[in-house]
Every structure is written in C-alpha cells, then in structure tokens.
Amino acid sequence: MSEPSRDAHQIPHGSKACRRLFGPVDSEQLRRDCDALMAGCVQEARERWNFDFVTETPLEGDFAWERVWGLGLPKLYLPAGPRGGRDDLGGGKRPSTSSTLLPGTAREDHLDLSLSCTLMPHSPERPEASPGAPGTSQGRKRRQTSMTDFYHSKRRLIFSKRKP
C-alpha cells in the first residue's frame, strides 16, 4: 500500500473538520431574517383568522370570536396539573401555568389543552392472550385490509411477439 499523503498529517488531531461552504455566518443578519419571517407569518395568520395572536385579542372581520370557559369541554381535554386544586374552567384539575405567558395577560384566561394517558399495570392473575387466540371474547374478528380493498387493481395488457 502507498503511504498516506502529507496533507493528511497537517490537520491537528484535536480539531474538528468543519467547512464553511458559503462563507462566515452573520448572526445579526440571520436573526433579522428570522424575525422578519416570523413577523410575516404572524401578520398572515392575523389577516387570515382576524385574531391578534401576540396580544391574544380578537379583531373585526369574518370570524366572531367568543371566550369558551371549558364548561362544555370533556374531561379528556382538561389535563391533571401538578397541583391538586380544582379549576373553575371545567371541573378538572387546574392546568399547569407557564411563566412564558405574555405580559398583560391573565393566567386564568389560558386553558392548556393537551392529552394525557395513564398506563395500567398488567395484572399477573390474568395472562394476556393474543387478539386472535381462541377463547377471547372480542366478538367478530377483523381481517387485515390491503390496498386492493379500497382501490381495484387494473390488469395491464402486455403485447409481445409469439415465439415461432
């Protein structure tokens, strides 16, 4: 085998191999571009939904916004918070409050809508059977569906010369 080239030994072993293909990064310009893009997105959403998402106030337009207090929301949408206190928004536990709320907005105005699930421990006295195993009381067994159940396949005609 040939010896390694001398150029490979010029790179110190402790340095990273990093290439800047398009020159140095201007952090200020990058921040300005991101801010301009974000402002454009906020303005587009404001015009589309007639709602100011920065100050969280409804605007005049095609939509009529009204406050929903959560009394009609199912408890599925009212997650349990770290505190045990009840909330006046829907009867569920009070959602966790975030310190990142905008200044000037009340914490009571926010309702955190998220889903939560609880894992149930497997009981050792009842072994888990496979869904298709005999003796399970699941009712009718569903079969595996395939794409041709929804889309009918078409036969393709292939014309070829016959062998003599």
Swiss-Prot record:
Q: Where is this region: Required for binding CDKs?
A: 53-58
Post-translation: what modifications?
Phosphorylation of Thr-145 by Akt or of Ser-146 by PKC impairs binding to PCNA. Phosphorylation at Ser-114 by GSK3-beta enhances ubiquitination by the DCX(DTL) complex. Phosphorylation of Thr-145 by PIM2 enhances protein stability and inhibits cell proliferation. Phosphorylation of Thr-145 by PIM1 results in the relocation of CDKN1A to the cytoplasm and enhanced CDKN1A protein stability. UV radiation-induced phosphorylation at Ser-146 by NUAK1 leads to its degradation. Ubiquitinated by MKRN1; leading to polyubiquitination and 26S proteasome-dependent degradation. Ubiquitinated by the DCX(DTL) complex, also named CRL4(CDT2) complex, leading to its degradation during S phase or following UV irradiation. Ubiquitination by the DCX(DTL) complex is essential to control replication licensing and is PCNA-dependent: interacts with PCNA via its PIP-box, while the presence of the containing the 'K+4' motif in the PIP box, recruit the DCX(DTL) complex, leading to its degradation. Ubiquitination at Ser-2 leads to degradation by the proteasome pathway.
Renumbered residue ranges of the record's region Interaction with TRIM39: 152-164
| Domain of life of the native organism | Eukaryota
Record-level GO cellular component terms: cyclin-dependent protein kinase holoenzyme complex; cytoplasm; cytosol; nuclear body; nucleolus; nucleus; PCNA-p21 complex
Q: Where does this protein have compositionally biased stretches of type Basic residues?
A: 153-164
Q: One GO molecular-function annotation for this sequence? A: protein sequestering activity
Region Required for binding cyclins, annotated ranges:
17-24
Predominantly, its location class is cytoplasm
Please tell me whether the keyword Manganese is annotated for this protein: no
Q: Which residues form the signal peptide?
A: none
Q: Where is this motif: Nuclear localization signal?
A: 141-156
Disulfide connectivity for this sequence is none
InterPro entries from the UniProt entry:
CDI_dom, CDI_dom_sf, CDKN1A
Q: Where in the cell is it found?
A: Cytoplasm; Nucleus
Stored Pfam families: CDI (PF02234)
Q: Cross-link (Glycyl serine ester (Ser-Gly) (interchain with G-Cter in ubiquitin)) at which positions?
A: S2
Q: Which residues does this entry mark as bearing N-acetylserine?
A: S2
Which key words are in the record?
Acetylation, Cell cycle, Cytoplasm, Metal-binding, Nucleus, Phosphoprotein, Protein kinase inhibitor, Ubl conjugation, Zinc, Zinc-finger
Which ranges belong to the motif PIP-box K+4 motif?
Answer: 140-164
Q: What does this protein do?
A: May be involved in p53/TP53 mediated inhibition of cellular proliferation in response to DNA damage. Binds to and inhibits cyclin-dependent kinase activity, preventing phosphorylation of critical cyclin-dependent kinase substrates and blocking cell cycle progression. Functions in the nuclear localization and assembly of cyclin D-CDK4 complex and promotes its kinase activity towards RB1. At higher stoichiometric ratios, inhibits the kinase activity of the cyclin D-CDK4 complex. Inhibits DNA synthesis by DNA polymerase delta by competing with POLD3 for PCNA binding.
What the entry lists under PANTHER family is as follows: CYCLIN-DEPENDENT KINASE INHIBITOR 1 (PTHR46778:SF1), CYCLIN-DEPENDENT KINASE INHIBITOR 1-RELATED (PTHR46778)
What protein family is recorded? Belongs to the CDI family.
Q: What does the entry's domain section say?
A: The C-terminal is required for nuclear localization of the cyclin D-CDK4 complex.
Q: How does it assemble?
A: Interacts with HDAC1; the interaction is prevented by competitive binding of C10orf90/FATS to HDAC1 facilitating acetylation and protein stabilization of CDKN1A/p21. Interacts with MKRN1. Interacts with PSMA3. Interacts with PCNA. Component of the ternary complex, cyclin D-CDK4-CDKN1A. Interacts (via its N-terminal domain) with CDK4; the interaction promotes the assembly of the cyclin D-CDK4 complex, its nuclear translocation and promotes the cyclin D-dependent enzyme activity of CDK4.
Name the UniProt record assigns to this protein: Cyclin-dependent kinase inhibitor 1
Task: Identify the species of origin.
Answer: Felis catus
